[in-house]
């Protein structure tokens, strides 16, 4: 009799085809190992007894031996997954990523399709912070799609660990604080977090920041770690003025210098400001009293603070 040592990822069918050259060899394994059943999960290091020189297909056995192949297909979940909640977010990852994770807190329920052969993961949200990580169990040819199904409201949502190349928010979601660091993608769907008041996008690389204009409840925004092109940052800053719409005042942190000089812009014949640069937009935001009544606008640019003060000489 021979002894076969199990390696990680092997199931009973792998052992049968490796030893006998056909899955029908399972019968001999069950006869020689009284403790064994078809429902058993084999573990690395387990040993099974088999009949020496009993081979159903010698060519298959010889092929594995010649090429040094040990079959280890594991147990795969190949059946359809059923989800009970609305599909809210889809993320796409490069197929070179071997794992992903994120943190979340809030109240409600979350169901995750990790885009591999694993079963759906269900996470109840009870108000405590939850950190979840996942190791993908199979490769994909193109981009890997991860789908998040959920209901409820979120206090904090950090997607940094996904390293997404694409982000699609398909339904409005109640989120208070959102974080996504060091991503290279479009943020066109962020307005689907209409109530968010704290956003950290440090290290974000994107061509357009104007989708952030839709976040009128925003009170804190961090865009550190990236030097944006002046037209990109200017378009956002100018939009904060031209599309103010009674939005909340906000603290915005940047590591890039907007165009122009921090000064009062020229006015047209109707007495309206004609904003010619990003710094002029900041001047208007930090000097318009009606826009600073509740809390002041504040801009931190490379450590220099521009902020509304009742004493106009202290506005820088």
Q: What is each stretch, according to the model?
A:
Residues 1-111, 118-203, 207-224, 235, ...:
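Cell-surface/extracellular proteins and modules involved
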Residues 224-227, 253-259:
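Short, loop-centered acidic/histidine patches that primarily coordinate divalent metals
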Residues 227, 242-243:
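C-terminal low-complexity, glycine/proline- and small-hydrophobic-enriched intrinsically disordered tails
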Residues 228-237, 265-267, 271-273:
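Leucine-rich repeat
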Residues 255-277:
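Short, flexible/disordered intra-domain loops and linkers
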Residues 290:
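A SAM-dependent methyltransferase catalytic signature shared across enzymes that methylate proteins
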């Amino acid at each position: 009799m021979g002894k076969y040592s199990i390696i990680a990822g092997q199931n009973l069918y792998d052992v049968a085809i490796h030893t006998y050259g056909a899955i029908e060899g399972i019968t001999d394994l069950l006869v020689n190992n009284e403790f064994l059943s078809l429902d058993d999960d084999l573990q690395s290091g387990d040993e099974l007894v088999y009949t020496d020189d009993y081979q159903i297909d010698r060519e298959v056995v010889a092929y594995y031996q010649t090429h040094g192949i040990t079959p280890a297909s594991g147990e795969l979940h190949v059946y359809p997954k059923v989800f009970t909640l609305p599909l809210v977010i889809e993320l796409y990852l490069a197929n070179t990523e071997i794992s992903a994770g994120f943190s979340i807190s809030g109240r409600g329920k979350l169901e995750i399709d990790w885009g591999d052969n694993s079963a759906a993961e269900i996470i109840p949200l009870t108000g405590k912070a939850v950190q979840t990580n996942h190791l993908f169990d199979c490769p994909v040819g193109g981009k890997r799609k991860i789908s998040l199904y959920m209901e409820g409201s979120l206090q904090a949502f950090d997607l940094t660990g996904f390293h997404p190349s694409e982000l699609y928010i398909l339904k409005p979601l109640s989120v208070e604080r959102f974080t996504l660091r060091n991503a290279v993608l479009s943020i066109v769907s962020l307005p689907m977090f209409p109530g968010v008041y704290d956003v950290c996008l440090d290290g974000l690389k994107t061509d357009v920041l104007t989708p952030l204009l839709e976040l009128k409840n925003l009170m804190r925004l961090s865009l550190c770690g990236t030097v944006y092109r002046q037209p990109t940052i200017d378009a956002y800053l100018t939009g904060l003025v031209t599309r103010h719409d009674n939005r909340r005042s906000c603290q915005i942190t940047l590591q890039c210098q907007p165009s122009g000089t921090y000064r009062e812009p020229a006015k047209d014949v109707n007495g309206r400001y004609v904003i010619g640069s990003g710094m002029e937009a900041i001047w208007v935001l930090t000097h318009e009293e009606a826009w600073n009544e509740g809390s002041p606008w504040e801009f931190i640019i490379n450590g220099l603070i521009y902020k509304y003060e009742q004493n106009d000489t202290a506005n820088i």
